[in-house]
Amino acid sequence: MLQEWKAMEKPEEEEIRARLAAAKEKLAKQQLLIKEQKIPVLVLMEGWGTAGKGSVIGQVIQNIDPRFFKVESMGEKSEEECRKPFLYRYFRRIPEEGKFVFLDSGWMDEIVKDELHGKLSDEDYAKRIESVRRFERQLTDNGYLVMKFFLHIPEKEQAKRIGHLEHEKDTVWRVSKNDLWQNRHYEKCEEAFSSYMKNTNMPSAPWYIIDAKSRKWTELQVLETLTQGIEIALSNQKLAVPLLQNVFPLVQMPLLSEVPLDKEIETDEYRKELKELQNRLGELHNRLYRKKVPVIIAYEGWDAAGKGGNIKRIAGALD
């Protein structure tokens, strides 16, 4: 997408100032309607290192009541997060009804980094892309407004900004190893970003590429796009978009009427088999723990059918 993208013509400074004032006023009014209509707004701010993601978020939130927003900057994963599905830590940070959450780099950044540094096989990368598509679709199906921005700057502009930051002792800390790596491998990163955006660009959650060479022009593009998205969401909360088909393989189960209820087992045989199976389950549990495989066991059934007792016997085999 980045290779085909063409930047809009930048307006004169006077026009930028006038449009900025109008966009800020519009967002200040819209936040109250967002609260009234209980629409959750998730803003993903992605882009190149030194493109100004944090700065533009800082400018946008000045127009929103502090009670109505949170800004999340994702650091290294905790031990708990490493054991959960990779989207788990992002799901925990999604906004509640009527509020905004701004993600200063999110799941795109994580996936593309892992893919570029060889931490994901082609198969794992494809699975993550599909997980993202389903996750974002799940959010929009449940009334979320998902706005995805990518701040784009040319290779020379990024190198120039890195040089300026490194020149001052008070700003050198802002240049990360990843920023330097990106600039050295700009074309490779550009291709990876483009591929990711192409694969996750959906009608219900499209990508907005922002020309980030100028700070005020960047702010104006983000604000105008955000307010347009909010305006559409306020007038049409339920977007008419088709549901994705379920592609998960399902185990064929018999109908309830086909399940035999007359089977019995002798007490001694039951106790013997139960002990053997509990021992086997304990061994499998240890293997699952070593391989960090999460397991969910769900119980349904008639009242007094023995769900609680069965859970106790299963749990008795586990640490």
Predicted features along the sequence, with ranges:
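Glycine-rich phosphate-binding loop of ATP-dependent small-molecule kinases
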Residues: M1-D319
